[in-house]
Amino acid sequence: MSPFDRAVLAERSMAVERHLRRVADRLPRSVEELQPATDASDAVILHLWQATQIVIDLATAACLHLNLGTPSTYADAFRRLGAAGIVDGPLAARLVRAAGFRNVVAHAYDTLDMRRVHDAAANGPPDLRGFLAVLRDRLPPEAA
């Protein structure tokens, strides 16, 4: 089975939704309320990272499936999909930033800026969902 089998894509989409619900459940309304090293910030960061990672994995698999080459980075997967017209340019650009956010979280490149975390958690989920919709709606039916 590939990530483009309907059952696998549906399962991964449901996993993304579960993570995004947990982000929404724990995300304080204001950035000032999101404090580092709290249960809320830990839950928001962990679940946003996990949802983003699933989408990244699907983007990488889509590049290979569509013969767009092997992305050199996670961000490159979204750039390739944008350049091929699979994902529209503005969405691809936002997903490139999501991949960068994922790297900061996963590799602790820098101290996490809670404003950036709050912004990503409040504004990023529609982009992750949008990408999943692209996979469902734009790829050929036999591949979706």
Region spans (language model):
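Solvent-exposed interaction patches of small proteins and small membrane subunits
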Residues: 1-144
